[in-house]
């Protein structure tokens, strides 16, 4: 759960890891499928506090934000707005699958589909907020033809270039 106790424990482990490695590490926001009743703060606040207290950076997975937002009913754009700009050092994009059942549906971060239009929109917002951050598209299963992968990468590059042109 996202509690002060869990944060204290994780900060200590992140600091220990960074001390052993002699360098900063990045922590990735997860995709989530359940919520803890005991949580005292939202994920984005926990992540920002972890980075601030430990000095680690954040690998911001935009697809994970979208998946979790859909699964739990929060505003994905609001998540981006509260993450401090300096802590984001890498961005991930991916695809997901929708599992339907009697009472609804759940999105699963499967890395086997193209990036969906809503995630591209969220990525555009992320680039507007955080700038030209190195971006990786994850595709681990049901890998398509190279042309599909290249097209996804080119779309991400175009969004980054658009941001660069605006900043110039």
Regions found by a protein language model. Give the residues of each.
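Conserved active-site loop/cleft motifs that coordinate metal ions or position small ligands
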Residues: 134-140
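Generic structural signal for well-ordered alpha-helices
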Residues: 10-18, 44-51, 80, 120-127, ...
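Gly/Pro-rich active-site loop or hairpin
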Residues: 4-7, 71-130
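Active-site acidic/histidine proton-transfer and metal-coordination neighborhood
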Residues: 1-57
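Conserved, mostly hydrophobic/aromatic
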Residues: 25, 61, 91, 135
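Active-site beta-loop-alpha junctions enriched in small/polar residues
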Residues: 30-32, 63-67, 93-98, 140-142
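C-terminal helical cap(s) of enzyme catalytic domains, especially alpha/beta-barrels
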Residues: 146-167
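Distinct, well-ordered alpha-helical segments
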Residues: 35-52, 68-81, 147-150
